[in-house]
A protein has these predicted regions:
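Right-handed parallel beta-helix
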Residues: 1-2, 15-26, 41-57, 67-115, ...
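Short, T/G/N/S-enriched strand-turn elements that build extracellular solenoid repeat scaffolds
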Residues: 6-13, 62, 119, 142
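Short, solvent-exposed loop/turn segments at conserved positions within beta-propeller repeat blades
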Residues: 30-32
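Accessory, usually C-terminal, subdomains that scaffold auxiliary metal cofactors
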Residues: 143-144, 149
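N-terminus-biased targeting/localization segments
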Residues: 164-168
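C-terminal functional modules
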Residues: 179-189
């Protein structure tokens, strides 16, 4: 497949697009505070088998444009979104209204501190794996963003990794709850 290094990739304004087997690697040479890939408006897009890493803000974000035009009917599937760089290290910010759907299906969010993803609006988050999400949220609906959300969250796996300060705690009914725990400093040796 094709690999794009060093700068942000934008799909803004596209319609009726299918993008497959693309690797996007922004890295530290990319613009500070920018996403590795994103959409600010557009419709009817499918992203399949992408690998998007090393973003300096988020790895892949979907938002309104500056004129308030919404992205509509977007699917990201069978993709890897991970290893956000620097202190921000986020998987993605996905924001629409409650009529413009975004589907995230069978993706791997890995090694991002938070926003794996952070969503607002109409969202389906189905059969994804979130691994090693650090000190932030594994999945965040709404958060401090204003606006309504209608979200379907089904059959996802949240796997604690080596930098997480979360642990699985078995409940009385044998269900598993993931709880945040204070981290102690790691000994140097």
């Amino acid at each position: 497949g094709v690999v794009l290094y060093g700068n942000r990739v934008s799909f803004t304004g596209a319609s009726n697009l299918i993008c497959r087997h693309l690797r996007i690697r922004m890295g530290t040479n990319g613009p500070d505070g920018k996403d590795a890939a994103g959409i600010a408006n557009g419709e009817n897009m499918i992203f399949d088998h992408l690998s998007v890493t090393w973003g300096r803000d988020e790895n892949f974000s979907i938002n309104w444009d500056s004129k308030g035009k919404l992205p509509r009917n977007i699917t990201i599937q069978n993709s890897i979104l991970g290893q956000g760089l620097q202190n921000h290290s986020c998987g993605g910010l996905i924001q629409t209204d409650t009529e413009s759907g975004i589907t995230l299906f069978r993706n791997l969010y890995t090694d991002n501190k938070t926003r794996n993803p952070k969503v607002k609006g109409l969202n389906q988050f189905v059969n994804n794996v979130v691994y090693n999400w650090g000190s932030g949220a594994a999945y965040n609906m709404g958060g401090d963003s204003s606006g309504q959300s209608e979200t379907t969250i089904e059959d996802n796996y949240f796997i604690v990794g080596p930098v997480d300060n979360w642990q699985n705690v078995r409940q009385e009914d044998n269900s598993i709850k993931v709880e945040k725990v204070p981290m102690s400093p790691t000994p140097p040796f």
